[in-house]
A protein has these predicted regions:
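Non-catalytic C-terminal accessory modules of carbohydrate-active enzymes
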Residues: 172, 375-503
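A ubiquitous short alpha-helical element
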Residues: 26-33, 174-179, 249, 348
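Active-site core of glycosidic bond-cleaving carbohydrate-active enzymes
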Residues: 106, 111-138, 189, 207, ...
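Helix-terminus loop motifs that line ligand-binding clefts
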Residues: 76-101, 127-189, 195-196, 201-205, ...
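The feature captures the catalytic groove of carbohydrate-active enzymes
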Residues: 4-6, 13, 17, 93-109, ...
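Well-ordered alpha-helical scaffold segments within catalytic/enzyme domains
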Residues: 49-53, 70-75, 115-126, 187-201, ...
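Alpha-helical packing segments of well-folded alpha/beta enzyme cores
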Residues: 7, 40, 64, 71, ...
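Acidic/polar, glycine-enriched structural segments that form the non-catalytic walls/loops
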Residues: 1-104, 498-503
Length: 503
């Protein structure tokens, strides 16, 4: 017979109220130890019913998926409190529990939150994704100071952020602090995803959402103007560190530059949604800069060099730390021919450090799924989690060797993206939601419970031959179902089951 351990924690800014809450909890335990446990179960059941991923006929893999989502959710604000919630200060790579001096990234917030943890949460728990973005809105004054200090317009976010939103990257990595400017593009892309998934006009119009988007675009416009090239008649973004941190300072990172272009382009779209009348001259300036930011591309080899001059690099500098240029295919979803996508994957697979972080291999898996190569996708999918998970509690480590950040929720977020956007086939576009699922090897299918889009919730069951879709919650936004082999639109009504061939 196993023992049941009950742990009570009360957290409140007011000591007296905190003590009262803790005493009330103690009384409940004394009165009925099962009562607290049942309340705990009920709270988590409601959370899971709002959004989860079920794996069919593979218990161990189910535990891994549930565990990954659980560890991220417990680091996010509670949705059932007796008091108004305080400002949320973001997710660190090691979650809320980790962050000692010079270990586990000291609890600081990086691009990890928006790029790796946020996308899966947005599709399953959009209210929590909004809370994640709220940290960046809260820290806009500090981001504005960061931009002004560099001589730029708008807002520039720090590589490592803390409770004030100021730059807190330690001196052990000054190049990271100064050169990893892509984080502002990453945050802008997260805002783009939020608007695409929710059409939250209140957030855009009255909660500073549009200002947030506009000011990030303003930073990129001024940043690109600094490096205008009269010879090529293109805007450059020089002196940056890309996601591949083995490159300290390079020019025209393909990932950074595409992030900048997308940020500026979306600002005009967001202005229309928000009903904001921007100056025509400003709009024209945005368009000119966005259209003319240089994107490295080899016409001869038909692939995206990681940065300008990449093809001339030799020796150790040719080794890539982690996924970089392949991120242009996903999550950035930059339009490219199939052969270019394939060439990017094949080239960078050969030169990526095989001891790198888990997220890298998940992005390769997603890429190969896009191209229909199930064997390659399976190979990289297995590599994206197997070496990083520690039993028995499914705790992840940053490195395969077990060192680095512990309970590495960044890796868990990347893994969940491979499940949801890779095998789930979900693609969140600005004007539509697409999905083209595949069966995860070793399972008989999956179920997406509470997939949220425009205020509607969907349950989607994916089997080998059939896909079942049910709308479980409706909003003022009606959503139509259009299959790839038909131009006929089916209006999704609540409770009505749609069965589709999964071929």
């Amino acid at each position: 017979m196993s023992d049941r351990w009950i742990s009570l924690v009360a957290i409140d800014p007011a000591k007296e109220r905190c003590e009262l809450d803790f005493s009330a909890g103690q009384r409940d335990v004394v009165a009925d130890t099962n009562l607290v446990y049942l309340r705990h179960l009920d709270a988590w059941s409601k959370k899971w019913d709002n959004g989860r991923i079920e794996i069919k006929d593979n218990l161990q893999f189910s535990k891994l998926v549930y565990g990954s989502l659980y560890y991220i959710l417990i680091s996010l604000p509670s949705d059932s409190t007796y008091l108004p919630t305080n400002q949320f200060f973001g997710l660190s790579p090691g979650g809320l529990a980790n962050g000692a001096n010079f270990t586990d990234y000291q609890g600081h917030v990086f691009w990890d939150m928006e790029t790796w943890m946020y996308p899966g949460i947005l599709m399953l728990h959009p209210e929590l994704a909004k809370a994640m973005l709220s940290y960046r809105l809260f820290s806009m004054p500090a981001a504005r100071e960061r931009a002004v200090a560099g001589g730029y317009d708008g807002i520039r976010y720090p590589w490592e952020g803390g409770s004030t939103g100021a730059e807190v990257t330690p001196d052990i990595c000054i190049p990271c602090r100064e050169n990893q400017q892509h984080i502002t593009g990453d945050i802008a892309f997260a805002a783009r995803q939020y608007v695409s998934a929710t059409r939250d006009l209140q957030w855009l119009q009255t909660e500073m959402g549009y200002e947030f988007i506009r000011e990030m675009a303003a930073f990129w416009v001024s940043r690109a103007e600094e490096d205008w090239n009269n010879d090529t008649m293109m805007y450059n973004i020089n002196g940056v560190m890309p996601p591949d941190e083995y490159q300290i300072s390079i020019n025209n990172s393909v990932y950074t530059n595409i992030g900048a272009k997308l940020s500026i382009m979306f600002a005009e779209y967001a202005a229309c949604l928000a009903g904001t009348a921007e100056d025509n001259a400003m709009i024209e300036k945005w368009r000119h800069v966005a259209e003319n930011i240089y994107v490295p591309f080899s016409e001869f080899k038909r692939y995206h060099p990681e940065f300008e001059g990449f093809e001339d690099v030799t020796g150790d500098r040719k080794i890539i730390k982690q996924a970089d240029a392949i991120l242009t295919g996903f999550p950035q979803m930059w339009s490219m021919p199939e052969d270019v996508r394939r060439n990017d994957l094949e080239l960078y697979e050969k030169i990526t450090d095989h001891g790198g972080p888990a997220m890298t291999w998940g992005m390769f898996s997603i890429g190969w799924l896009e191209l229909g190569d199930k064997n390659k996708a399976r190979e990289f999918f297995h590599k994206s989690y197997s070496p990083y998970v520690r039993e028995p509690f499914k705790v992840w480590t940053e490195a395969q060797s077990g060192i680095g950040a512990v309970n590495f929720i960044t890796g868990m977020g990347g893994f969940l993206q491979t499940v949801l956007f890779g095998y789930g086939g979900v693609r969140l576009r600005v004007e539509k939601l697409e999905f083209d699922p595949e069966i995860i090897p070793g399972t008989s299918g999956m179920r997406l419970v509470g997939l949220d889009y425009l205020g509607n919730s969907l349950n989607i069951d994916v089997y080998e031959e059939v896909i079942k879709i049910v709308k479980t919650k409706a909003s003022e936004h009606t959503i139509d179902l259009v299959t790839s082999d038909s131009k006929i639109k089916f209006i999704l009504h609540s409770g009505k089951i749609f069965l589709l061939n999964n071929v």
